[in-house]
């Protein structure tokens, strides 16, 4: 699965999301639960704003010294017997991983949850080579067996499905014969996945944070699949975005606490795993061979720009969980594996404005996302910068918008035109007016007035009322 999901136009995706009542209900309920848990976890920690500032400082420091820490990480991974590959593009990353698997004659692959492997379209590349690739995160596994349904949330990828829908998928794909009880569904999936773990030749994981001074990679999970993926297969491949790095375990401790509290409202997740190279002589667990693939794929182009702060992201989805737009349209409406406010900022940077020029406008600019972000990314400000670039640098504003703004500028800068427009506006809008409201607006007002009240122009203008009042006052004074 590549970063881009679906081929429908943005407006069509949004309409589909709005029409999906179950999805909107599920998203709204999940947002409320996760928001409440996050606030409780933040209050329990205490001094939340100070923790946010510290986390921001750590991420900013890493980005400003990224060359050094990437070099240190690569050196320490190599010292411990691992292999490091820097991939400039998604194609380079996928090709390297494919070559490693072919050299090991690997055919059965298990994966833990990883957004960057979806970004580089890894599963499709490996499946074309005849490999069996199994997602072992339960949410991702559900989506995979359901015809590779795209994720709709960074942390909870199957958020858009209910237990009845999951039961039906299991019945059709896994010969499931039980009820929709979550416990029964999980036990059935667990039995299948356990066998896959034991049969796998290759394990592929993502990386929440790489620790530069030890050459370690970390996995933060609640299901334990990350440990099985990284210890049972003989060859482990970890794939990470180049910015997902911390100097030492001291900084890791801070960020992982912020990640778990912001993502799911937990002090810590059930499993926090740090892996350092292949197993040593005499060790029982762990891979015999370890590869770390560090992916650029457009990230270096963001460094040093006005958008650099977006690379501070720790993928907690706190911004998604408070976003009113996401609540109404869902994750698939964004057309990217990165949804919500972070996706609206990041997707155009990694995928370009051709595919994602609408996303910066999918925001009310309420700044709830910026307030929720544990590393203080000013997301609403970055969305505005995107809009500015789209109009001024890219020249991609719709023709209708350009004409409307030009007409407004012309009318607002000419007193005679402004007077004429305000005088004739009530008459011009009469066919669209009902009960002093525009009920069926023309042009761009049509969608607005279908679900909102838009006041009709008043028949008497303020300037006329004010002039009449002044005349009346002068008359009284003269009398």
From Swiss-Prot:
[4Fe-4S] cluster 1 binds at residues 313, 316, 319, 373. InterPro entries: 4Fe4S_Fe-S-bd, 4Fe4S_Fe_S_CS, FTHF_cligase-like_sf, Helical_ferredxn, LUD_dom, LutB, LutB/LldF, LutB_C. Keywords: 4Fe-4S, Electron transport, Iron, Iron-sulfur, Metal-binding, Repeat, Transport. Disruption phenotype: Cells lacking this gene are unable to grow on minimal medium with L-lactate as the sole carbon source. Cells lacking the lutABC operon exhibit little or no defect in biofilm formation on MSgg medium, but form small colonies that almost completely lacked surface architecture when glycerol is replaced with L-lactate in the MSgg medium. Gene3D superfamilies: Alpha-helical ferredoxin, NagB/RpiA/CoA transferase-like. It comes from the Bacteria. Induction: Is under the dual control of the transcriptional repressors LutR and SinR, which allows the lutABC operon to be induced during both growth in liquid culture and biofilm formation. Is induced by L-lactate, which relieves LutR repression. GO terms for molecular function: 4 iron, 4 sulfur cluster binding; L-lactate dehydrogenase activity; metal ion binding. One of its GO terms (biological process) is lactate catabolic process. [4Fe-4S] cluster 2 binds at residues 323, 366, 369. PROSITE patterns: 4FE4S_FER_1. Residues 304-334, 353-382 form the 4Fe-4S ferredoxin-type domain. Pfam families: Fer4_8, LUD_dom, LutB_C. Belongs to the LutB/YkgF family. PANTHER family: LACTATE UTILIZATION PROTEIN B. Is essential for L-lactate degradation and allows cells to grow with lactate as the sole carbon source. Has probably a role as an electron transporter during oxidation of L-lactate. May also allow cells to utilize an alternative carbon source during biofilm formation, since it contributes to the formation of architecturally complex communities when lactate is present. NCBIfam families: LutB/LldF family L-lactate oxidation iron-sulfur protein. HAMAP family: LutB. This is Lactate utilization protein B.
């Amino acid at each position: 699965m590549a970063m881009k999901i679906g081929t429908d136009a943005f407006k069509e995706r949004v309409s589909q999301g709005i029409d999906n009542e179950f999805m909107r209900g599920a998203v709204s309920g999940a947002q409320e639960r996760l928001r409440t848990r996050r606030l409780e976890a933040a209050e329990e920690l205490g001094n939340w704003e100070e923790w946010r500032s510290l986390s921001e400082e750590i991420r900013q420091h890493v980005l400003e010294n990224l060359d050094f820490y990437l070099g240190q990480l690569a050196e320490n991974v190599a010292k411990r017997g691992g292999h490091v590959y820097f991939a400039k593009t998604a194609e380079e990353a996928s090709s390297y991983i494919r070559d490693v698997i072919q050299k090991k004659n690997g055919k059965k692959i298990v994966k833990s949850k990883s957004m960057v492997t979806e970004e580089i379209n890894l599963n499709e590349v490996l499946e074309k080579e005849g490999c069996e690739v199994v997602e072992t995160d339960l949410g991702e596994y559900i989506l995979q067996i359901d015809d590779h349904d795209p994720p709709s949330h960074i942390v909870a990828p199957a958020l858009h499905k209910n237990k009845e829908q999951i039961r039906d998928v299991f019945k059709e794909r896994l010969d499931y014969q039980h009820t929709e009880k979550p416990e029964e569904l999980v036990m059935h999936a667990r039995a299948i996945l356990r066998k896959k773990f034991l049969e796998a030749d290759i394990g592929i994981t993502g990386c929440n944070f790489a620790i530069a001074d030890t050459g370690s990679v970390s996995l933060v999970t609640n299901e334990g699949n990350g440990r099985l993926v990284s210890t049972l297969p003989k060859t482990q491949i970890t794939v990470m975005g180049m910015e997902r790095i911390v100097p030492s375990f001291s900084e890791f401790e801070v960020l992982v606490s912020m990640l778990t509290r912001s993502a799911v409202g937990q002090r810590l997740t059930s499993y926090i795993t740090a892996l350092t190279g292949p197993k040593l002589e005499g060790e029982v667990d762990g891979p015999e061979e370890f590869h770390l693939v560090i992916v650029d794929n457009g990230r270096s182009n963001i460094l040093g720009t006005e958008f650099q702060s977006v690379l501070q992201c720790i993928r907690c989805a706190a911004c998604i969980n408070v976003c009113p737009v996401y609540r109404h349209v869902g994750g698939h409406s964004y057309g990217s594996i990165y949804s919500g406010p972070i996706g609206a900022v990041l997707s155009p940077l990694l995928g370009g404005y051709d595919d994602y020029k609408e996303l910066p406008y999918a925001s009310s600019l309420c700044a709830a996302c910026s307030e929720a972000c544990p590393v203080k990314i000013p997301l609403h400000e970055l969305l505005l910068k995107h809009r500015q670039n789209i109009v001024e640098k890219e020249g991609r504003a719709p023709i209708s918008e350009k004409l409307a703004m030009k007409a407004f500028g012309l009318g607002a800068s000419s007193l005679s035109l402004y007077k004429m427009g305000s005088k004739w506006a009530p008459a011009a809008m009469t066919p669209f007016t009902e009960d002093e409201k525009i009920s069926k607006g023309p042009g761009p007002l049509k969608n607005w007035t279908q679900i909102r009240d838009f006041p009709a122009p008043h028949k008497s203008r303020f300037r006329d009322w004010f002039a009449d009042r002044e005349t009346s006052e002068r008359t009284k004074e003269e009398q």
